[in-house]
Swiss-Prot record:
Composition bias type Low complexity, residue spans: 80-89
Keyword Cell cycle: yes
Name of the protein this chain belongs to: Cell division protein SepF
Keywords: Cell cycle, Cell division, Cytoplasm, Septation
GO CC entries: cytoplasm
GO terms, biological process: division septum assembly; FtsZ-dependent cytokinesis
Top-level taxonomic group: Bacteria
Chain spans, region Disordered: 15-89
Length: 197
């Protein structure tokens, strides 16, 4: 029975809802606020002096913050900002200068490889990923493995946006995108191959 009585008035069903105007809403809100303030004041007055002393001690134990911001004027702030911007302008490096110096350092190195097994191809690909040109000599490896290596390097070069060129009999030049190859010797190679046949 007690449980039934507990939930008896829990749900309120009204057949007609009253629509309050804006003035009525404001007056009801203000009445609620006044009621809340009165309840709060009653609770504060009923507090024991001991709890009041504890609150005072807690307030005293909070450290005071020094606010330098409020002491500075807008002129001082503007002066500081101007000085900071002048100092920072000397430290700015444009991206074009940085990338040019980076590419100049990286493009000056070329790696030579003579793979004996297919697993050596990963070292060649790592050098290409590090933006270094590689010259690959496949004369001392069987033709099947050489074809697999060239296929792998072609995919690597394509992925990094570079280029692969044949520069001799079973010798290939693989270059990343930061290296340009000027000239062509493939015509000369083809003429040499026809001459030997």
């Amino acid at each position: 029975m007690a449980l039934k009585d507990l939930f008896n008035n829990f749900f309120v069903v009204e057949e007609e809802e009253e629509v309050e105007g804006p003035e009525e809403r404001e007056s009801s809100r203000s009445r609620e606020r006044v009621q809340e303030r009165e309840d709060y004041n009653r609770n504060e007055n009923q507090a024991t002096p001991q709890t009041f002393n504890n609150k005072q001690q807690a307030i005293k134990s909070v450290p005071q913050k020094n606010t330098l911001r409020s002491n500075t004027t807008s002129e001082e702030r503007n002066y500081r900002m101007n000085n900071n911007s002048k100092n920072n302008s000397r430290n700015v490096v444009t991206m074009n200068q940085a990338s040019q110096s980076y590419t100049a350092q990286e493009s000056s190195k070329m790696c030579l490889f003579e793979p004996r097994v297919f697993s050596d191809t990963q070292d060649i690909a790592d050098e290409l990923k590090n933006r270094r040109a590689t010259l690959v000599n496949l004369q001392r490896i069987d033709q099947v493995s050489a074809k697999r290596i060239i296929d792998f390097l072609s995919g690597t070069v394509y992925a990094i946006g570079g280029d692969i060129q044949r520069v001799g009999t079973d010798i290939f030049l693989c270059t990343p995108d930061n290296v340009e190859v000027a000239g062509s010797i493939t015509d000369h190679i083809e003429n040499m191959e026809q001459h030997y046949e």
